[in-house]
Amino acid sequence: MKPTVLTENSRVEGCSFIKQHKFSSGHIVPIYDVSTMNALNQIIGHVKFQNANYGNVYYRGVSGLYDNVLPALMRGRTKGIPDDLCQALNSIINDSYFQNSLKLSTTVVPRKKDDFSFNKRVTRYNKYCAEALLQHYAGSTRFLDVVDNHWVALWMGLHEFKTHGKGKKFFHSIRRSLSAWDMYEAQMKDDNFEINKNIYAYILLVAMPYPECPPQYGIIETANFVEVDLRKALPSIYLRPHAQHALVVRRRDKGNIEQKAGYYDMASQVTAILRVRIDRVSNWLGEGTLLTQGNLFPSPSIDQGYNNLLMNSEIFKDPFDIKKYF
């Protein structure tokens, strides 16, 4: 069963069909321009309703569109079985400090046949948890970040993340803005007769299938995908994902027979793309402190889990070193 893609004939007032977006995989989805808050709520609700028998629909806020939806670690790689990531995950789940801090499940001494499959599953789920942790605090794994709160997705699409300092180890978010003159300039067509795309924030609506078995500690494993709700998989001392309403999703490794990086492209799960002009996004979000970097990326003085990661930096080697936000 596949997710239902929104058609180009939606009649939601305040939404205008722009064009079809074709990913390199061949998957095609519509781009809709959204001009009102009510229209945003309604068209998201419509996509959820269309996929009610398939699964949940999550949101990925981005500042630009690409021809794929590859996780960060797989961009620029050809090999789909990353030995460096596997080594990092083993280091985390075998470290006694993080076994306790992350409340990882423990294996049992095998006494019967079923114990071996139990231990294998425990190890696999512990690695899912560790990889989800790395995705949120290091930012480069096989997982893709999504949220189930569309104003957080809008915030992510409104901001650009810049690197600073030696080795580009420090990160800071910059809120994009649009003056009246910028708006006039941006609407002018360029030499290719295309409207400037830098004036928009985008939300990718990503559908994930329902599980056949109940989730365990926020982890859902289906035939082809893994989904981790970090608010359930990680203790709340790891505050950032709880502030962001964060989940991560990816394809399961077992289907990557050819061991290619492109296997992890999640474009097939995108059901629609919504674009909103950044001046509208800024107006809708307002100036509340809940939607600031200070809340969504709390400092290590507040986010105890973040501090734990920074204090154990010897485990987290490039490209899985913990990113520092300021």
PLM regions with names:
Residues 1-326:
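Catalytic-core elements of nucleic-acid end-processing and repair enzymes
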